[in-house]
Amino acid sequence: MAQLNQNFIDTITQELPAHLSMDDFIAACDRPLRRSIRVNTLKISADDFKTLMQPKGWTFDPIPWCKDGFWISYDEEEQLGNALEHIQGLFYIQEASSMLPPTALFTPSAFTPSAKWQCVLDLASAPGSKTTQIAALMHNSGLLIANEYSASRVKVLHANVLRMGASHCALTHFDGRVFGEYLYESFDAVLIDAPCGGEGTVRKDADALKHWSLNDVLAISETQKALIESAFLALKPGGSLVYSTCTLNRLENQGVCEYLKQTYGDAVQFESLSDLFEGAERATTPEGFLHVWPQIYDSEGFFVAKLTKTASVPRLQPEPTLQKNFPFTPATTKQAQGIKDYFQQDLGISLPDDLIMVRDDEFWLFPHEFRDFIGRMRFQRIGIKLADSTKHGFKVRHEAIIALAGKQLSPTAKTVDLSDVEAKEYLMGRDISLNTAVKAQGEVIVCYGGAPLGMAKHLGNRLKNNLPRDLVKDKVLLLSEQIKSL
């Protein structure tokens, strides 16, 4: 049972909309969340994913605000994170409400008729659900900078970006309050899913509100105000900003947005989200924000606001000096052609027309748009590592296969499709015996369900596993008999 602090109840009773009841709110807080996932369209379409999973007993209940999101039901004794298709990056386990902010950011409106952003900032990214959703909405084009303040969470973010095949990301590790200074008016769109009190998460954490206090809310709202101001300064004139939290009180939600409006006046134009999806008006505030109480859509509590920056505003700090000693250099024409030929001729992959960069013996692929950000900030990770140069040519990197060996594959690519049992063995680091001995084929891409798992060396009678050791799993779940129909 949810532990609802009486001070929280007293505060939220005053803020609950007139058409909602406190009894329904408390009852909703005690109900477990429906399980939800988002299909990763960077690797597979929603329709193809359904076709893949229906023989395994899956049924799909669509989430109205995310065309690739679905509620599912499964045996809760099993860890869905160990599922073969999850490890493969075909889907992300994501709470339905958290799919709202990217949808709001990329939905055209009266103020933003086109959502084809080239440079997007996700200011507080980890663990990566919204980052990878944005990457899918951008179709792995343009540049997505994903920032995370917590060092340990940067590692989780990086792992999820790689697993989902998001190739046009650059990761940073900074306090989000510096972006308005370092990358002033640089982004077409900014998402800030702000750190918050987490009041909306009580359905998955019964103790989330046990120690709630107004002083904590006031303190965190000051941080949120600084973050939204930094995000606004980093936004180009004419760009869109979405501010979201998984909390419910006005101080952390409407109060933060009102602070920005009071500070920058007419440069801040709120956009109504009442038409974002069918039924959105049930959660729309007078300002046009979405204030999602858990009983409205049987989901987590959430808040989403969207605004347009209608004019440039003065920067608060002088432009910082450009940093020197960037460790990457553009590949020479000969180097670039060599790596392109290797990918095309040996792997059957056509490299995208992006920046091929070199660091020592490493070849990397950067988004073209990253060129304008060189020297302006320190980055933890940029784009994808393609290959290492060796005495005998190149050795492809696993992350390049995961990101590029889907829609980029040519019909002549050397691939081997595995059964689910074989795919499980592969992900557990084991070699795969072949039923029929044939001529050895060298490096091949192993796939399951039409999406790549990694590389192997075809030795004629078996596939020698080339999965990086740090990605080998102790347990891989086959879902054939685990998912229950709704």
UniProtKB/Swiss-Prot annotation:
Compartmental location: Cytoplasm
Alphabetical list of Pfam families matching this protein: Methyltr_RsmB-F, Methyltr_RsmF_N, Methyltranf_PUA, YebU_pre-PUA_dom
Q: Which reaction does it catalyse?
A: cytidine(1407) in 16S rRNA + S-adenosyl-L-methionine = 5-methylcytidine(1407) in 16S rRNA + S-adenosyl-L-homocysteine + H(+)
GO cellular component entries: cytoplasm
Where S-adenosyl-L-methionine binds, per the record, is at 124-130, 148, 175, 193
Organism domain of life: Bacteria
Name the InterPro entries on file.
Answer: Methyltr_RsmF_N, MeTrfase_RsmB-F_NOP2_cat, MeTrfase_RsmB-F_NOP2_dom, Nol1_Nop2_Fmu_2, Nop2p, RCMT, rRNA_ssu_MeTfrase_F, SAM-dependent_MTases_sf
The record, for HAMAP family, names: 16SrRNA_methyltr_F
Q: What is this protein's function?
A: Specifically methylates the cytosine at position 1407 (m5C1407) of 16S rRNA.
Under what name is this protein listed? Ribosomal RNA small subunit methyltransferase F
